[in-house]
Design a protein with these regions (language model features):
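Positively charged n-region of N-terminal signal peptides that target proteins for export
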Residues: 1-5
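Bacterial N-terminal signal peptides
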Residues: 7-16
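Short loop/turn motifs that connect adjacent beta-strands in outer-membrane beta-barrel proteins
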Residues: 20-25, 47, 75-86, 116-120, ...
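Transmembrane beta-strand segments that form the barrel wall of outer-membrane beta-barrel proteins
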Residues: 22-34, 44, 48-58, 87-97, ...
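Residues that define the transmembrane beta-barrel architecture of outer-membrane proteins
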Residues: 24-26, 34-36, 48, 62-66, ...
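Residues on the lipid-exposed face of transmembrane beta-strands in outer-membrane beta-barrel proteins
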Residues: 30, 38-42, 52-54, 68-74, ...
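Predominantly the C-terminal beta-signal and adjacent terminal strand-loop region
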Residues: 63, 116-156
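Mid-chain, well-packed structural core segment of small domains
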Residues: 80-122
Length: 156
């Protein structure tokens, strides 16, 4: 299993496209999924970024949820679309602190639209999950979100 994950990460690193997707900036916004929380994204290169989510609840079912992913983006150009339309994939992890703590792997697959001359981006993703602690089980998350991007060039 570890070899398969390592192979996936190395293959993704070696085949990552060089198209300039965003390349800079830090995004902060909201992600609507299970659980809904605060979404961040930090661009680390022309087509790579780290993203993270933090979510919490203090109702009857108290929990704290954290995830982090390393993402690879591919730029798709269209004459009909003025902004940047990106697909992305990645690998990451998640931790859920609740009655039953969970630790697992994430493989996000998504689309991202970066508005032209605007500091906003929106995204939709489907994420296969593999929890490893306290027991091995799989799941699937679906999310949508919006972020305000700080440090994005005004000409984009």
């Amino acid at each position: 299993m570890i070899r398969s994950i390592l192979f996936f990460v190395l293959t993704a690193l070696l085949t990552c496209g060089t198209a300039q997707a965003q390349g800079k900036g830090f995004g902060l916004g909201i992600i609507v999924d299970d659980p809904t929380g605060i979404s961040t994204k930090l661009w680390t290169g022309k087509s790579t970024a780290f993203d993270a989510e933090v979510a919490w609840s203090y109702d009857q079912d108290e929990f704290l949820y954290l995830h982090g992913d390393f993402l690879f983006h591919n730029l798709h150009l269209s004459k009909e679309v003025k902004g940047k339309f990106l697909t992305y994939y990645g690998i990451g992890g998640r931790v859920e602190f609740a009655d039953s703590n969970k630790v697992g792997l994430r493989i996000p697959l998504g689309i991202n639209y970066i508005f032209p001359k605007s500091p906003l981006d929106v995204f939709f993703e489907i994420v296969p999950l593999l929890d490893l602690v306290p027991e091995t089980e799989s799941d699937l998350n679906v999310a949508i979100g919006i972020r305000f991007v700080f440090g994005k060039g005004s000409s984009e």
